[in-house]
Amino acid sequence: MNISPTPKRYQSSNHMPRAVNHNYHSAVPAYHEHAAGQNADRIVPDEYKINSNMISSLIKQNKDLLAKLDEKDRELEKLNVLVGSLRGKLIKYTELNKKLQAQAQAARVPSPPEPAAEPAADYLQLPRRAPAAENDKKIGELYDKLEQLTKVVHQQHLHDPPAPARPRSPARSRSPARTAVSDDDIMISESSELKRLEEQVDQLKRKVLIKSENELRKLSLNQQLADLMHKLGVSSSSPASSALLFDRQPSPTSAASSAPLAHAHCEQCHHAEDALKKPAMDIKNALQTPTPSRTRRDAHPHTHTTHHATNALW
């Protein structure tokens, strides 16, 4: 019980300047009786608040998961029922299929022949045999006509002479397209043959030209070798020089062409064949500076300058 003479003075926050909380923002006064419960949780630490919030969220998630699990269980029950019905239908249709296959196999197998029915005339109680049907009469007439026609055709075939071979139709024999194609084929074959012959001729010409060039080059190289050997004064009677100069025998085709060249070579070298008969250099002068041996060419007036130039080099 409030014994203050002015109790309302202290119950209002407007008349308590030291009790005013400037950080408090709420529609309910700070010292109101309804606000006492709001300030009561200030003593609870923040960790407990966080834990309680997490626990409440986990409980909610657990409830949701349980609801989903129940829904999945219901779906599984429905699917099991559907699978059972489908299994029953499958068994039913497999049995029906086996039955139909057995019937089809039995239909394919020929049935045993039934015993022939006895004619009605054999029975005494029947006065006479039943008349044949109208269709049977027509079938018999058709068979008779067919036999007559086959006989007539056979007799006509025997009496007629063999037919001559059919001539080719003028449309086919005189067809311009076929003649044009045959002419084109002939022209193509002839042109291909001519081209092949031309290639062979060109190849042979190339071979002959290469052979002649080789022969001429061989002769020119032999001539140059002989000239160089005479300029250096090397004895031509040595086996190396004879092997280089006369390594191959001239072919009969090139003998006639090489005759004038050999004659010119002999005239130019002034009877170079005489140099082959001269003896080699003396053993005493073997270690001395080599000098060209004197030949008939040195006495000739137009080779005097060449001989002096060679001696100057040595």
Swiss-Prot record:
Alphabetic keyword roster: Coiled coil, Cytoplasm, Cytoskeleton, Nucleus
Biased composition (Low complexity): 168-178
Region entry Disordered, spans: 154-186, 288-314
Taxonomy, superkingdom: Eukaryota
UniProt GO cellular component terms: cytoplasm; nucleus; spindle pole body
Pfam families: Spc42p
Compartments in which it is found: Nucleus; Cytoplasm, Cytoskeleton, Microtubule organizing center, Spindle pole body
Chief site of localization: nucleus
Coiled-coil ranges (or none): 52-109, 184-215
Family, similarity comment: Belongs to the SPC42 family.
Function recorded in the entry: Forms a polymeric layer at the periphery of the spindle pole body (SPB) central plaque which has an essential function during SPB duplication and may facilitate attachment of the SPB to the nuclear membrane.
Protein name in the entry: Spindle pole body component SPC42
